[in-house]
UniProtKB/Swiss-Prot annotation:
Pfam families: Amino_oxidase (PF01593), NAD_binding_8 (PF13450). This is Renalase. The lineage of its organism: Bacteria, Pseudomonadati, Pseudomonadota, Gammaproteobacteria, Pseudomonadales. Keywords: FAD, Flavoprotein, NAD, NADP, Nucleotide-binding, Oxidoreductase. Substrate binds at Y57, F58, T59, A60, R61, S96, P97, D98, T185, R308. Belongs to the bacterial renalase family. Catalyzes the oxidation of the 1,2-dihydro- and 1,6-dihydro- isomeric forms of beta-NAD(P) back to beta-NAD(P)+. Has a preference for 1,2-dihydro-beta-NAD as substrate. May serve to protect primary metabolism dehydrogenases from inhibition by the 1,2-dihydro- and 1,6-dihydro-beta-NAD(P) isomers. It comes from Pseudomonas syringae pv. tomato (strain ATCC BAA-871 / DC3000).
Length: 328
């Protein structure tokens, strides 16, 4: 009997590792506490259509990741997004064009992880609470008390604070991961029946509770029935308002949006708030991945590198590479 490899987390990092291991002929089984894959790369279904509440776009600087992105493009899962960009600084809104190539999933961000997952076995709505090792193999315990296993190795591909709670069997790794701080982000979606009279499709914001905003419908193949906008608050504002109600957050960020935009803003016909508790690492690390190869446990995620989508993908590749290297 072939004992599969367990991978906890179906964001970009976990699926990147899963793809690399599957390509090398290994069996994997994925676990995720959510109802679908993607993590911060997921799109939220709503009455206003699919909304990219998390990652807004991504860039490809590393040659290996750029190759993967070109494959996704050829398969029809991603497209370039060329928004009319603005910058808001010192109370002034000004055009801010650049040469950066930006990619988005189509018809939503979750198209990418859905394609990466393919037909790999996965247990959704399954929150793993404990990872423990028997004499030969690993087993996982979920929040319902159900046991999963045996597994030959475990890869934990979650935000650092969630990973550290699963590393009781690997105290050295646990202490490193426990030192990683991640910043929160409040995200708000607003939809308007009458399109806002502005050419702006994306905006980097300074001196405001907002950090970024985007016209969701300006992305390729998005639903354009309503004029949908995604607002991201700064890490600082999000931390200060971590426990605010969704209604309070929507009201405050809607107000900040109205202050900076250079047109009349009607009342939205739809609004939604989502709190990303672990949106991005507070500092940069250059680990690639973390591992205790003798134990057979590996940790990866965007926080092991740049905090970007590319960093998550590269971290998953590195975790898989280390695991395969140890098997040789």
């Amino acid at each position: 009997m072939t004992v599969p490899i367990a991978i906890i987390g179906t964001g970009i990092a976990g699926l990147s590792a899963a793809q690399a291991l599957t390509a090398a002929g290994h069996q994997v089984h994925l676990f995720d506490k959510s109802r679908g894959s993607g993590g911060r790369m997921s799109s939220k279904r709503s009455d206003a259509g699919a909304l990219d509440m998390g990652a807004q776009y991504f860039t490809a600087r590393d040659r290996r990741f750029a190759t993967a992105v070109k494959q996704w493009q050829a398969q029809g899962h991603v497209a370039e997004w060329t928004p009319l960009l603005y910058n808001f600084h010192a109370g002034r809104l000004s055009p801010s064009p650049d040469e950066q190539v930006r990619w988005v999933g189509k018809p939503g961000m979750s198209a990418i992880t859905r394609a990466m997952r393919g037909d790999m076995p996965v247990s959704f709505s399954c929150r793993i609470t404990e990872v423990f090792r028997g004499e030969e193999h690993w087993n996982l315990l979920d929040a319902e008390g159900q046991n999963h296993g045996p597994f030959s190795h475990v890869i934990i591909a979650t935000p650092a604070p969630q990973a550290s709670t699963l590393l009781a069997a690997a105290p050295k790794l646990a202490s490193v991961v426990a030192g990683v701080k991640m910043d929160p982000t409040w995200a708000v979606a607003l939809a308007f029946e009458t399109p806002l009279q502005t050419p702006m499709q994306g905006c980097f914001v300074q001196d405001s509770p907002l950090d970024w905003l985007a016209r969701n419908r300006s992305k390729p193949e998005r639903d354009d029935t309503l004029d949908t906008w995604i607002l991201h608050a700064t890490s600082q504002w999000s931390r200060q308002n971590l426990d605010a109600s969704r209604e309070q957050v929507i009201e405050h960020l809607h107000g900040a949006f109205a202050e900076l935009i250079d047109c009349t803003m009607p009342a939205p016909v739809f609004s939604l708030a989502h709190r990303w508790l672990y949106a991005r690492p507070a500092g940069a690390h250059e680990w690639g991945a973390l591992s205790d190869a003798d134990l057979g446990i590996y940790v990866c995620g965007d926080w092991c590198l740049s905090g970007r989508v590319e960093g998550a993908w590269l971290s998953g590749q590195e975790a898989a590479r280390r695991l395969l290297e140890h098997l040789q």
